[in-house]
Amino acid sequence: MSISVIDERSALDDLLSSCYGAIYAYGVIAAYLSDPDEALNAMASFRIKRDQLLTSFEELGYPAPPASAAYSLGTPVVDEPSARVAAAILEEAGVAHWANALFYLPSQIKQRECEFLQACAVRSFSWSGIAKAFSFAD
């Protein structure tokens, strides 16, 4: 789900929603991989990010939106190659969501969120083998 980002609150809502969706998606993706560790590590990264964002919601006095019961993966996942494609697309979407939100985020979390954007770009490259914007980041 994509939220129209127009201010600080909507930026945070969009990022949290992206985390919820990614956590769900990586559970499905991991089930189709012969070695699910990479997907489970990515899921753990999104869980940590979700928790950081929930703390930011609390500190800023905003109510955090709840997670949905299920999410669309955006592409069918039926085997290992399609799971890897879904993971790459998921991380590319993460780059887009974080890039869109950065302008509106509070200054105290911008650096942290920029680093997460870069981590999404690196994971996208890891899944697809195709370099995208920001793939130079460690």
Which residues does each predicted region cover?
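All-alpha RGS (Regulator of G-protein Signaling) helical domain and cognate RGS-like helical scaffolds
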Residues: 1-138
